Amino acid sequence: MLEDFKRTLSNMFSWIFTVHSTGLRFSSVALFVAVICLLLNWRAAGVIFLIVAFFCAFFFRVPKINVQFNEDEIASPADGTVLSIKTENDPNSVVIRIFMSVFNVHVQRAPVDGKVGEIFYHKGQFLFADKPEAASQNERNLMQFFHKADPNRFAHVEQITGAVARRIECWVKPGQEIKQGNLIGLIRFGSQVAVYLPKNSVRVVVKEGQKVQGGNTVLALWK
């Protein structure tokens, strides 16, 4: 029966966006409980679970993108607001940090065509994702991406949890070939994504405070 609810939800939202399978699981359970509550005439509870079902579908939405990037363009891996653009621990890299509120799309996409390098997972705390200390203290997962045409060009993506986001999903493996815009992972319920680029090889075209969209916005250009 839950599979029927999953198909129903998927069809309901398909004209606006698709819903990732993770979200369909949450939404279908909430919708199932809502129907039971309404059948038992527990209207308030039924309405609450209907809202939960919609919220889960909305949160795990995967918007359809159809952007063709030029060879010199680096795509944003995430939706959100640019928190900072600066050199941090590595003097040869520039780091673009993107804050994702609970209302942003929370899937991440590959910033370049290329190959996945190493993947580094670090356990940590669950501080608010927009705080500076979250970058070094929170649970995080770093995925290395190397450009298909030049392995010296990289665009590493780091998923960072927040106070509400407490689950990182990584959907790629070391050595995997990847296309720009392909889905690479997800962070649940509000978080931060950092993009590491070679400082002397790129020109950043976004600004702090700017809204960006994963797979749609150009973050930087290769020189």
Stretches with model-predicted labels:
Residues 1-223:
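Contiguous, well-folded functional domains in the mature portion of proteins
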